[in-house]
Amino acid sequence: MTFRIDCLQYANWSEKIFRQMREGGVDAVHVTIAYHENFRETVLNIEAWNRRFELFPDLIFQGRTGDDVRRAKETGRTAIFFGFQNPSPIEDDIGLVEIVHTLGARFMQLSYNNQSLLATGCYEAEDAGITRMG
């Protein structure tokens, strides 16, 4: 079985886009739900996605495992996987990793463009690499 997966996407999400994904045969999408948001702001983004899942259950659902990609293909829907471009949602609390995973996050970059608590970003003049927390 072959799958079509969009490995990273950020858009002005709407029913029109969800229908276009289905027309294009997209089985799964890694959706950016945090660039530089803190934990609370990220939870608000997840809340907005939960409303979309309720409004468009015939088009999308929250993906959590590889089996969800298969289920999406079999049911003619798109599995939405949450990801962060930077670890800002975990703030300075490593325990929040488990919490955001429970809420559905499946991808988290150690850094985006700037220095994070975990690693150096590509825009930094000095590359210090992974931090002690990272």
Give each language-model segment a name.
Residues 1-128:
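N-terminal hydrophobic targeting/anchoring segments and the immediately downstream early-domain regions
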Residues 130-134:
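Loop-centered beta-sheet repeat module
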